[in-house]
Amino acid sequence: MKKEVDRCVLAFEEAKKGKTVSMICSGDAGVYGMAGLMYEVGVNYPETELEIIPGVTAATGGAAVLGAPLIHDFCLISLSDLLTPWEKIEARLLAAAQADFVVCLYNPSSKKRHDYLQKACDLMMKYKSPDTICGTVSNIARDGEEAHVMTLKELRDTQVDMFTTVFIGNSQTKEISNKMVTPRGYRNV
């Protein structure tokens, strides 16, 4: 972290020399990835063509492991305050909770932000029931992958790290066979 601009400039400089260059990042380059920054830096390299190739982001990868939590409207929110002030993150959490979105949290904890998931859960519980179905997936598609389904009040005291993606259900989300499922609203089911 913190050397992303340098990586982008280096990629463009190498491309300027006639090389074919790839910028690799985890997940999907267009979801908390490098695609936006590549376009921003690319303004200074108008002769270089960019192609963004989609990947599998933690939200969709983790959702598949948990069951089907993202079947209805949802939002992604990063708890990292490195590039976004906490006040803005807090406002987004409250708005998402009030609107009854399923919320997928990225970057739920770090050494400096060990209590941010607790803060996020407290904010969510202003509009969501403590019994809201939630889930976590750690090390998605890696060795040591783990998934857990729990309530929002249990999530509040769950230990997570930067390799964990957190899913907070909406008022319709339920647990089915230890999987997290958000109904789409089909009748007669």
Name each model-derived stretch.
Residues 1-3, 79-81, 139:
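Short beta->alpha junction loops
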Residues 9-12, 35-39, 60-64, 118-121, ...:
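Predominant activation on well-ordered alpha-helical scaffold segments within soluble catalytic domains
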Residues 20-21, 98-189:
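A contiguous loop/helix-start segment that scaffolds small-molecule binding in enzyme catalytic cores
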Residues 31-99:
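Class I SAM-dependent methyltransferase SAM-binding "motif I" and its flanking Rossmann-like core
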